[in-house]
């Protein structure tokens, strides 16, 4: 076998291989012997068919199969010998084949980039230092009460957190526009559902009032014909309701799994959940900064085959989220996912090099801790832990999470890490 390797462009490679004619003939004869042992031909017992008849009937197809097998096996041998690491599926380009002559073919593919990590010492990471305070717990309790609130009609003017029912008609330059008209529209104020200025224009008005408000659509508004346009909305306010928050009764508290129904028990449970969320948020904030610094410090080429593969993964995930099927997933424009796919491939290659150079392996103690932490959010943590322990795929996924954490820690060990006092609310809003 003769082998030559050339660089086509960037990460592209072409391996040209020549297989000696005698190697091909030896393999063909060997395979014909195997075929002769199995075939049945009228007039001959199984395994007793003369080789010339076997060759006459099956020679062409056997030769084709043998060539395909030799091409594949010789390519694998060649890349092992040349220490080449292909990325993605190779493209075989067969040359002209004549019986009794050497056979030359080429294989085109991309290789993984040679990554040499640099600039780790210049990465800057700001670690949030956060404590869950009693005031934070109070805010969360109010949020829980608001989620369980009922609505009661009121006579006064609409306030920032009221719920209103209204009719409205929007116009731009005196003309109505699509989506700008509604009847008996229910709007919970203070959630930012409407364009800026709309809710402010409703506040202070009472039931039965008809009025007009002036607003301007944001420049980044989704409808092209409305971006940055001034608009008027004629409004008829038909109902104003205010929240009635439930009291922290024993019955209310037990809804959240606090068996003794006490306020102290609820506060303790809420604090525990907040601290678990906080731990994850701090971890994610530090991780995102470390990865961003790693990517900026290391500009690497990326095999297009890996990007294509990642795009397919993202397409399928998007289709699943919206109830689509495989066919619909593949029809989604690749442009929607290309940037994210490339980013994920780059991050994967860089973290892979961190893992390789630091000879990291998943710490089973960490894996166990991650599973226990995740399971603590469920009603029966022991059941969740047992379910994970019996599922190889889930365990492998968690080992990958642990290994990624260890890689991030290896980056942080060389990076410039500082601390910054932050409130719980500020950090969680950054995560949103």
From Swiss-Prot:
The protein's Enzyme Commission number: 5.2.1.8
Disulfide bonds: none
Any one GO cellular component localisation term in the record: cytoplasm
Keywords: Cell cycle, Cell division, Chaperone, Cytoplasm, Isomerase, Rotamase
Gene3D superfamilies per record: 3.10.50.40, Trigger factor ribosome-binding domain (3.30.70.1050), Trigger factor, C-terminal domain (1.10.3120.10)
Residues annotated as domain PPIase FKBP-type: 161-246
Protein's UniProt keywords contain Isomerase: yes
Catalyzed chemical reaction(s): [protein]-peptidylproline (omega=180) = [protein]-peptidylproline (omega=0)
Alphabetical GO biological process terms: 'de novo' cotranslational protein folding; cell division; chaperone-mediated protein folding; protein transport; protein unfolding
InterPro entries: PPIase_dom_sf (IPR046357), PPIase_FKBP_dom (IPR001179), Trig_fac (IPR005215), Trigger_fac_C (IPR008880), Trigger_fac_C_sf (IPR037041), Trigger_fac_ribosome-bd_bac (IPR008881), Trigger_fac_ribosome-bd_sf (IPR036611), Trigger_fact/SurA_dom_sf (IPR027304)
Domain notes: Consists of 3 domains; the N-terminus binds the ribosome, the middle domain has PPIase activity, while the C-terminus has intrinsic chaperone activity on its own.
Function text: Involved in protein export. Acts as a chaperone by maintaining the newly synthesized protein in an open conformation. Functions as a peptidyl-prolyl cis-trans isomerase.
Family: Belongs to the FKBP-type PPIase family. Tig subfamily.
Protein name from the UniProt record: Trigger factor
Upper taxonomic lineage: Bacteria, Pseudomonadati, Pseudomonadota, Gammaproteobacteria, Enterobacterales
């Amino acid at each position: 076998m003769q082998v030559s390797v050339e660089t086509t462009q960037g990460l592209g490679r072409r391996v040209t291989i020549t297989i000696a004619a005698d190697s091909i003939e030896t393999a063909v004869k060997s395979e014909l012997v195997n075929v002769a042992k199995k075939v049945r031909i009228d007039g001959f017992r199984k395994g007793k068919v003369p080789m010339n008849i076997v060759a006459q009937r099956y020679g062409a197809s056997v030769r084709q199969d043998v060539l395909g097998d030799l091409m594949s096996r010789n390519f694998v041998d060649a890349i092992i010998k040349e220490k080449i690491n292909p990325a993605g599926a190779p493209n075989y380009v067969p040359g002209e084949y004549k019986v009794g002559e050497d056979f030359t073919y080429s294989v085109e593919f991309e290789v993984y980039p040679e990554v040499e990590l640099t600039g780790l010492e210049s990465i800057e990471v700001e670690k949030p230092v956060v404590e869950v305070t009693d005031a934070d717990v109070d805010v969360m309790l109010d949020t829980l009460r608001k989620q369980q609130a009922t609505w009661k009609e009121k006579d006064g003017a609409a306030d920032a957190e009221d719920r209103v029912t209204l009719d409205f008609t929007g116009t731009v330059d005196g003309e109505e526009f699509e989506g700008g008209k509604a009847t008996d529209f229910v709007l919970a104020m203070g959630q930012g559902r409407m364009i800026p200025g709309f809710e402010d224009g409703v506040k202070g008005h009472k039931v039965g009032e008809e009025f007009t408000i002036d607003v301007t659509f944001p420049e980044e508004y989704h409808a092209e014909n409305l971006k940055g346009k001034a608009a008027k909305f004629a409004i008829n306010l038909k109902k104003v309701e205010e929240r009635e928050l439930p009291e922290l009764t024993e019955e209310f508290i037990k809804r959240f799994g606090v068996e003794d129904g006490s306020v102290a028990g609820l506060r303790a449970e809420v604090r525990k959940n907040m601290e678990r969320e906080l731990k994850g948020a701090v971890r994610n904030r530090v991780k995102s900064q470390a990865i961003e610094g790693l990517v900026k410090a290391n500009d690497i080429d990326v095999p297009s085959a890996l990007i294509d593969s990642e795009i397919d993964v993202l397409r399928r995930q998007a289709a699943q989220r919206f109830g689509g099927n495989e066919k619909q997933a593949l029809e989604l424009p690749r442009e929607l996912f290309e940037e994210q796919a490339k980013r994920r491939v780059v991050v994967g290659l860089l973290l892979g090099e961190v893992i390789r150079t630091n000879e990291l392996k998943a710490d089973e103690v960490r894996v166990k801790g991650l599973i226990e932490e995740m399971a603590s959010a469920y009603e029966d943590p022991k059941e969740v832990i047992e379910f994970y322990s019996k599922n190889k795929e889930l365990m492998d996924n968690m080992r990958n999470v642990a290994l990624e954490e260890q890689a991030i820690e290896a980056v942080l060990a060389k990076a410039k890490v500082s601390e910054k006092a932050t409130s719980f609310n500020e950090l969680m809003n950054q995560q949103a």
